[in-house]
């Protein structure tokens, strides 16, 4: 079975995450997608609570599964007492899904930071890396394929970011074009990202 791991803070999950998941399923021939909500060691703190981010990620998974059940959510990283790194998550998924071929889905922004990740060189022993390019990443910043972190690169142009969504929500602007309706409703009902 080919299982993809898609980790992130999902603060909030948005249409880019949804489209990437569906795109990856078709292009990478995935059988299962594990959406893992995490604490980002490179960010000071999330704007929404762990519970809210998990709830929104569950809504994202429901949206992904409308096209056919293959996604599930994992809260394993949030349950860890200290920082959880990608290598830890991959080892956990290997234990849970023995024999599966693992694919790590990352955006180009994350891929560019990978050399700074803990145990970056170990990651390749556990998975294939699938990188999804973003139009808002300057090509001059993108190194050629890192020989130490080879990856499969996919062109993926979905110009939406969680930062932009949080700013719009804080300013009382509509966000419905950037997030699935279930997530927009959750954000409004729970008054997330309000100033």
Swiss-Prot record:
InterPro entries documented for this protein: Cyt_trans-like, NadD/NMNAT, Rossmann-like_a/b/a_fold
Catalytic activity: nicotinate beta-D-ribonucleotide + ATP + H(+) = deamido-NAD(+) + diphosphate
Associated pathway: Cofactor biosynthesis; NAD(+) biosynthesis; deamido-NAD(+) from nicotinate D-ribonucleotide: step 1/1
SUPFAM superfamilies registered for this protein in UniProt: Nucleotidylyl transferase
Single annotated GO MF: ATP binding
Keywords for this protein: ATP-binding, NAD, Nucleotide-binding, Nucleotidyltransferase, Pyridine nucleotide biosynthesis, Transferase
A Pfam family recorded for this sequence: CTP_transf_like
EC number(s) per entry: 2.7.7.18
Gene3D superfamilies xrefs: HUPs
Alphabetical list of CDD domains matching this protein: NMNAT
GO biological process, one term: NAD biosynthetic process
Function of the protein: Catalyzes the reversible adenylation of nicotinate mononucleotide (NaMN) to nicotinic acid adenine dinucleotide (NaAD).
Family: Belongs to the NadD family.
Protein name: Probable nicotinate-nucleotide adenylyltransferase
Organism of origin: Chlorobaculum tepidum (strain ATCC 49652 / DSM 12025 / NBRC 103806 / TLS)
């Amino acid at each position: 079975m080919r299982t993809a791991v898609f980790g992130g803070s999902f603060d909030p999950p948005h249409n880019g995450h949804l489209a990437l998941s569906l795109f990856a399923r078709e292009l990478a021939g995935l059988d299962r997608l594990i959406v893992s909500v995490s604490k980002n060691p490179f960010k000071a703190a999330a704007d929404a609570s762990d519970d809210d981010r998990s709830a929104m990620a569950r809504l994202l998974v429901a949206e992904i599964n409308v096209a056919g059940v293959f996604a599930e959510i994992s809260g394993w990283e949030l349950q860890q007492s200290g920082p959880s790194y990608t290598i830890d998550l991959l080892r956990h998924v290997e234990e849970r899904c023995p024999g599966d071929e693992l694919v790590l889905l990352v955006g180009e922004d994350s891929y560019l930071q990978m050399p700074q990740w803990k145990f970056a060189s170990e990651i390749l022993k556990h998975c294939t890396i699938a990188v999804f390019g973003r139009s808002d990443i300057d090509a001059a910043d993108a190194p050629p394929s890192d020989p130490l972190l080879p990856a499969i690169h996919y062109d993926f142009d979905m110009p939406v970011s969680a930062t932009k969504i949080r700013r719009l929500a804080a300013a009382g602007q509509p966000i419905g074009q950037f997030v699935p309706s279930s997530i927009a409703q959750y954000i409004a009902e729970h008054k997330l990202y309000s100033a």
